[in-house]
Regions:
Chain B
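Periplasmic/extracellular loop-to-transmembrane helix junction in inner-membrane transport proteins
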Residues: 3-16, 20, 41-102, 122, ...
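Cytoplasmic-entry segments and transmembrane alpha-helices of multi-pass inner-membrane transporters
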Residues: 18, 109-148, 186, 313-318
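Membrane-embedded alpha-helices of multi-pass transport/permease systems
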Residues: 40, 108-115, 132, 143, ...
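Transmembrane alpha-helix signature in integral membrane proteins
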Residues: 85-116, 229, 298
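Generic hydrophobic transmembrane alpha-helix motif, especially the helices
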Residues: 134-179
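Interhelical loop and adjacent transmembrane-helix boundary motif
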Residues: 157-159, 243-293
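Transmembrane alpha-helices
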Residues: 186, 195, 203, 209-246
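C-terminal transmembrane helix and the adjacent membrane-cytosol boundary/short C-terminal tail
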Residues: 188-192, 196, 203, 230, ...
Length: 282, 318
């Protein structure tokens, strides 16, 4: 419906205001929902502008930017060296703006004595190399793995950031939705799961250490936006060159406290205020 | 004039009307055929497209594969990976395991209930039990699935000390609950269809109610019961929501029923929504859909066949 509304809006506006800015946003599926909400809110405040948002994946979005078929590319990862080169060949100079943050919490059962794990241990656990809690200093019990279905952005993000693109253990039980994962871990004393920040109810968040020597950090809005929590990432918008005019107005609005509040409403983590201000286009 | 209102002009109308009604009757058939064609069409690239075959050929889906150099060959379902793996064996095993548990749980209960209601229960008791069991059929599977995920899994784990909370037994029992009304209804109908003359003959020969039921009615209705079991099996294989929620969805090769399983239907439900359109993964999911379609079609056909044979036999036509 929302997308339909955007399309209808597009048609109407095309008839009424010939000079209206027409912006296309394309890319990451993780960011589609946020992009759509931003577009809706922005269009409410600026009735003249028309924004079209679609997904397809970060790679698709970046390809579209390189081919000049989108104004804004949404990406849940930074562009690769190779992609920058491709863009240059086509006369495109990508301009990167971090617009929001995203983080993943690791859940443990409240009865589990383990309270913190390193990224290496997490990788070992989820790739199936570590199968017993005693290998990470816990009880002599089999580790029961819970995760998300492979269609979820969370699945991909965790795989990329924690497993370094290695496969999940075949034994990982996948459940539809973070709520189901939290529920399963809350009932399974030896379970471990992952999902969005601020979901932990009836389970405890596991503090995560970047490596053996660093401090264990619990996932909260503050530690993610402060950058100390290791399983987090920046989400980007890419433009062709430094944005001007309508595009500039849009990105600055998205970075404004108002835009960042929208991000928080749809379960993303807002950028710290100073970073958001710094990222704004002058 | 009034008398000949239906002649001769209305011949055409009659013809059209008749064909229209026939078309309505055929609509379901055409629907099924079109659905099958559509599903199969999306699976075709597995057999024809070189590029797709490189990732997911028929042999890659069936046999053990070496995915990384220097590692043991294995069956694995990991479609989202740097090396996508599309082995169907773990999924097939999971589907069968869930269906077996479902049948082991549902058949004794459903057949027992059918024998009781058709042979022993008083009229009032029968009027009470039948609708309640048939009400189970109307229970949305998502509700059953949720029940299995939240309640049943814990009960089973506490009672039997399973390592894995969500496993083939948990999913199978929940599936069994969904299958009971199917088996019960068909089996009960089959027993009721046993002609009264046969019963009367048995009673006349001095058989008591137990003997009538177990040596007379049950053997006569056996094909009907078998048909119910077969139809129930078909449902157990195709049922999606329950297994998606209650089985744990881990695609592993294991003979143990206490471990998690991933079924064909749950795989399609979980992965199709976000799969890249036209990718090998997309084709494989539709191939699984085709397999499921054929499985359930053949099974249901078999069930119907048995049922028809029974009817003919009881009516003395064969």
């Amino acid at each position: 419906m929302k997308r339909l509304a955007i399309v209808v809006g597009l048609v109407l506006a095309a008839f009424s205001i010939a000079l209206a800015g027409n912006i296309t946003i394309k890319g990451s599926d993780t960011l589609v929902r946020l992009g759509q909400r931003w577009a809706e809110e922005y269009m409410k405040g600026n009735p003249g502008s028309v924004i079209q948002v679609s997904g397809g994946g970060s790679g698709t979005g970046i390809a579209a930017l390189i081919n000049g078929t989108t104004d804004i590319c949404q990406s849940s990862r930074p562009m690769k060296e190779r992609e920058y080169k491709l863009a240059q060949d086509k006369g495109i100079t990508p301009h990167e703006v971090a617009v929001a943050l995203d983080g993943i919490a690791v859940f443990l059962n409240e009865k589990n004595p383990i309270a913190e794990l390193t990224l290496t241990q997490l990788k070992g656990i989820y790739t199936g190399v570590i199968t017993n809690w005693k290998e990470v200093g816990g009880a002599d019990r089999r580790i029961i793995l819970y995760g998300r279905e492979n269609n979820s952005g969370t699945y991909a993000f965790f795989k990329e950031h924690v497993l370094n693109e290695e496969d999940y253990a075949d034994q990982t039980q996948t459940l539809p939705g973070t709520a189901a994962v939290v529920n399963a871990v809350s009932k399974d004393e030896w379970g471990i799961g992952y999902g969005g920040i601020a979901w932990a109810k009836g389970v405890k968040d596991c503090a995560v250490k970047k490596d053996d020597t660093s401090q264990a950090v619990l996932p909260t809005m503050e530690t993610v936006s402060g950058g100390s929590y290791p399983i987090s990432r920046e989400l980007y918008w890419y433009f062709n060159g430094v944005p001007t005019g309508e595009l500039k107005a849009l990105v600055n609005w998205a970075l404004s406290p108002e835009g960042q509040k929208v991000a928080e409403e749809v379960d993303y983590i807002p950028l710290p205020k100073d970073v958001a201000e710094k990222n704004m286009i002058e | 004039m009034e008398k000949y209102r239906f002649k001769p002009k209305s011949r055409i109308r009659e013809f059209i009307g008749e064909k229209f009604i026939a078309l309505n009757a055929l609509a379901a058939l055409i629907g099924i055929l079109l659905i099958f064609i559509f599903i199969f069409k999306e699976a075709v690239p597995i057999f024809t497209d070189r590029e797709v075959q490189e990732e997911a050929s028929l042999s890659k889906m069936l046999y053990k594969q070496v995915y990384y150099e220097g590692r043991e060959p294995k069956w694995s379902w990991q479609p989202i990976s740097t090396v996508p793996k599309y082995s169907l064996l773990p999924l097939f095993l999971g589907t069968i395991k869930a269906a077996i548990v479902a049948m082991l749980f549902a058949v004794p209960l459903a057949v027992g209930a059918a024998i009781y209601t058709s042979e022993f229960a008083s009229r009032r008791m029968r009027e009470f039990i039948k609708p309640i069991i048939e009400l189970l059929a109307g229970l949305p599977s998502v509700v059953l699935g949720f029940f299995a995920l939240v309640v049943l899994a814990t009960v089973l784990q506490k009672s039997f000390g399973f390592t894995f909370r969500l496993n083939a037994i948990n999913a199978g029992v929940a599936l069994g609950i969904a299958v009971i009304p199917i088996i019960f209804t068909v089996a009960e109908d089959a027993m009721n269809a046993v002609p009264k003359s046969l019963r009367d003959a048995a009673i006349a020969l001095g058989a008591n109610p137990w003997q009538v039921s177990f040596t007379m009615v049950l053997p006569a209705a056996l094909p009907g019961i078998a048909a119910g079991v077969v139809l129930g099996f078909g449902r157990a294989i195709g049922e999606t929501m329950i297994v998606l929620m209650a089985s744990g969805n881990a695609a592993i090769i294991s003979a143990r029923f206490t471990e998690s399983i991933r079924t064909f239907s749950a795989t399609i439900a979980a992965e199709l929504a976000e799969v890249v359109f036209g990718s090998p993964h997309y084709n494989v999911l539709f191939f699984i859909g085709t397999l499921l379609f054929i499985f359930t079609f053949v099974i249901n056909l078999g069930g119907d066949f048995i049922l028809n044979r029974l009817k003919e036999r009881l009516q003395g036509k064969s």
